């Protein structure tokens, strides 16, 4: 098959591993920077171009679209979809998962466990917002933040009020969540592929830090999931409409709680912690599902 990988970083671990895994299985792979693409949209034959040339036909596209380019990256991916190319994660699922508030609302409607979450627009609502999530300590999150950036633990009510007021003053969209103390600065990343969790790791925050993101200095280790955790992770990914997702769970006194569903989960941490060939599993999934939709293009 001919496979396109939408990525700004051909040198990144995840991109290189996907190229390696696809090549080993006999596929032709091209890494495409979505920001270099431009599109011809018409009723006869839509197309995608780079540098004055039209892209050749592809059988499948694997999106590795960073949060900062969600709008344009999703538009390019949507163009591939319009042209009949199988997308591992489609543009709707990616856009849905990137909206943290919408994600929470959708999962809440499906009865998926979540930290109590509050959202408000007016500073006058701050006291009620804090009470709504159980008071301090609490977590304040920028809706546009990634990799632990824009996440603040407010340990006192006064600190919470000050931080929320500051964010609101900057016209930043935030949400407020209860702090799950019993998680002890750890979360679980479940790597969902289709209807299975193919790998999972526990991420532990550095001493004195509550964010467990590996980009923030957290450490990763192998973890054994409970059947409930496995089920919750798969349901969360399906709620977003994603075939591939990194679902982040907290272990609480009242069961697993979903923190976030990531539509472009990194491979380095999960493969390093589990020694599993996650990239190979992704390519195998693409093979099975792309071939169901159309005849493969000859590489």
Swiss-Prot record:
GO biological process: protein modification process; SOS response; translation
A GO term for molecular function: ribosomal S6-glutamic acid ligase activity
Residues noted as binding Mg(2+) 2 in the record, renumbered to the chain: 260, 262
Swiss-Prot/TrEMBL cofactor(s): Mg(2+); Mn(2+)
InterPro entries named in the record: ATP-grasp (IPR011761), ATP-grasp_RimK-type (IPR013651), ATP_grasp_subdomain_1 (IPR013815), RimK (IPR023533), Rimk_N (IPR041107), Rp_bS6_RimK/Lys_biosynth_LsyX (IPR004666)
Protein family (similarity comment): Belongs to the RimK family.
A UniProt-annotated Pfam family: Rimk_N
Residues at which ATP binds: 141, 178-179, 187, 211-213
Gene3D superfamilies found in the cross-reference section: 3.40.50.20, ATP-grasp fold, A domain, ATP-grasp fold, B domain
Cofactor: how and how many bound: Binds 2 magnesium or manganese ions per subunit.
GO cellular-component term (any): cytoplasm
Name the record gives this protein: Probable alpha-L-glutamate ligase 2
Residue positions binding Mg(2+) 1: 248, 260
Its EC number(s): 6.3.2.-
Binding site for Mn(2+) 1: 248, 260
The ATP-grasp domain, residue ranges: 104-287
Residues reported to bind Mn(2+) 2: 260, 262
UniProt xrefs under PANTHER family: RIBOSOMAL PROTEIN BS6--L-GLUTAMATE LIGASE (PTHR21621:SF7), RIBOSOMAL PROTEIN S6 MODIFICATION PROTEIN (PTHR21621)
Gene: rimK2
UniProt key word Protein biosynthesis: yes
Lineage: Bacteria, Pseudomonadati, Pseudomonadota, Gammaproteobacteria, Alteromonadales
Keyword entries, A-Z: ATP-binding, Ligase, Magnesium, Manganese, Metal-binding, Nucleotide-binding, Protein biosynthesis
């Amino acid at each position: 098959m001919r496979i396109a990988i939408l990525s700004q970083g051909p040198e990144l671990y995840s991109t290189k591993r996907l190229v390696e895994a696809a090549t080993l299985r006999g596929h032709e792979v091209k890494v495409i920077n979505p920001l270099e693409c431009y599109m011809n949209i018409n009723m006869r034959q839509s197309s995608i171009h780079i540098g004055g040339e039209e892209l050749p036909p592809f059988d499948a596209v694997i999106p590795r679209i960073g949060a900062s380019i969600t709008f344009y990256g999703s538009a390019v991916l949507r163009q591939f979809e319009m042209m009949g190319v199988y997308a591992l994660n489609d543009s709707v699922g990616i856009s849905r998962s990137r909206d943290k508030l919408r994600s929470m609302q959708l999962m809440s409607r499906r009865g998926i466990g979540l930290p109590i979450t509050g959202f408000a627009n007016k500073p006058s609502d701050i006291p009620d917002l804090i009470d709504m999530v159980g008071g301090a300590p609490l977590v304040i999150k920028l809706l546009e933040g990634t990799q632990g950036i824009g996440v603040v633990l407010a340990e006192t009510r006064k600190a919470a009020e000050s931080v929320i007021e500051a964010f609101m003053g900057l016209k930043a969209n935030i949400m407020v969540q209860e702090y799950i103390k019993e998680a002890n600065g750890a979360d679980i990343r479940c790597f969902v592929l289709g209807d299975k969790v193919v790998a999972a790791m526990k991420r532990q925050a550095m001493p004195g830090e509550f964010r467990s993101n590996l980009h923030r200095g957290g450490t990763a280790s192998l973890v054994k999931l409970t059947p409930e955790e496995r089920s919750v992770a798969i349901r969360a990914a399906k709620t977003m409409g994603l075939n591939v997702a990194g679902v982040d769970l907290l272990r609480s006194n009242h069961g697993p709680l979903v923190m976030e569903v990531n539509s472009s989960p990194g491979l380095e941490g999960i493969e390093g912690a589990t020694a599993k060939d996650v990239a190979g599993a992704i390519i195998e999934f693409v093979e099975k599902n792309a071939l169901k939709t159309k005849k493969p293009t000859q590489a």
